[in-house]
Amino acid sequence: MSLRDKLDAYLRLARMDRPIGTFLLLWPCLMALVLAAGGMPDLKVLIIFVIGVVVMRACGCIINDYADRKLDSHVERTKSRPLASGEVTVKEALILFVVMGLLAFGLVLMLNPLVVQLSFVGIILTIIYPFTKRFTNMPQMFLGVVWSWSIPMAYAAQLGTVPVEAWWLFAANWCWTVAYDTMYAMVDRDDDLKVGIKSTAILFGRFDRQIIGLFQLAALGCFIMAGLSADRGLVFALGILTFIGFGLYQQKLIFDRERAPCLQAFLNNNWAGMVLFVTLGADYLI
C-alpha cells in the first residue's frame, strides 16, 4: 500500500471523510459556549473547542472501530472500514488513537483546571462507549452522555464553574442524541441482530418510532428550558419551531423503517442542530 493510500485509510478511520458526527457534536458545544458567555465566547476558548471536537470525534471513531473490528466485516454499512478491511492494522489504529488523545489533552491544558478534570471523565466515557454495545440494550443512552460531555466542559471553560442552567442543555442534547442515534441504529438493525450487537432500535422494537418521538419531545422541552433560563427571545423561539418541523419530517422518513430513509432522517439532524445554534447566536445579536 502506498503512503497516499495509507494516509487515506487513516483519514477514513478517523471519519474525516464523513463530518456528520463532528457537526452533531459541534452544534451543542457551540450553543453551550454562547449561552455561557451570554453572546460571543472568548476567541481562544472557541478555537480550542472547535479543534477539540474534531480531534475527540476522531478518537471516538478510532476506538469504536477497534472494538468492532471483528464484527464490522459482517455488517453491510461497515464492512469497508479500514480496520475491518485490513487497510489499517490494530497497532496502527491504537497509535493513532493515542496521538489524537494526547493532542486533545494538550488542548485542554490551555484551559482552567476544572476543564482538565472534566476531560478525564470525557476520555474514559469515550473509551467505554464502544464496548457497551455488547453488554446493554441501551448503548445510545450512554452515547448521549458521551456526546453531551462537551457542554459542562464548555461552561467550565467560559465561567470556571458549571451552573445549574448548563444541565438543561445537557439533558436536551442527551435526549436528542438518543433519538437520532436510534434512527441510525435502525439502519443496521437486521445486521446487528445477526452478529449480537445491542441497540435501542432493537430494544424498542415495534414501538421504535413512538419512543423516538418521546425523546424528541423531551429534547424539545429541555431546549426550551435552556433558552428560558438564558432569557432568550423571538429569534431562538423561531429556531425551536423549526426544530419541531425537522422532528416531524424525520418521523415521516422513519415511518416504514427502511434503511435509506432512516439514514436520511439521522443525517437531517445536522440541519436541525445548525438551525438551533444559528438562531441562538442571532438572538444575542438582535
From Swiss-Prot:
Cellular component, GO annotation: plasma membrane
Reaction catalysed by this enzyme: all-trans-octaprenyl diphosphate + 4-hydroxybenzoate = 4-hydroxy-3-(all-trans-octaprenyl)benzoate + diphosphate
Localization terms from the record: Cell inner membrane
GO BP annotations listed: ubiquinone biosynthetic process
EC number: 2.5.1.39
Keyword Magnesium: yes
Pathways involved: Cofactor biosynthesis; ubiquinone biosynthesis
Keyword terms: Cell inner membrane, Cell membrane, Magnesium, Membrane, Transferase, Transmembrane, Transmembrane helix, Ubiquinone biosynthesis
Predominant subcellular localization, coarse grouping: membrane
NCBIfam families in UniProt: ubiA_proteo (TIGR01474)
Family annotation (PANTHER family): 4-HYDROXYBENZOATE POLYPRENYLTRANSFERASE, MITOCHONDRIAL (PTHR11048:SF28), PRENYLTRANSFERASES (PTHR11048)
Primary role: Catalyzes the prenylation of para-hydroxybenzoate (PHB) with an all-trans polyprenyl group. Mediates the second step in the final reaction sequence of ubiquinone-8 (UQ-8) biosynthesis, which is the condensation of the polyisoprenoid side chain with PHB, generating the first membrane-bound Q intermediate 3-octaprenyl-4-hydroxybenzoate.
Name of the featured protein: 4-hydroxybenzoate octaprenyltransferase
Origin species: Shewanella loihica (strain ATCC BAA-1088 / PV-4)
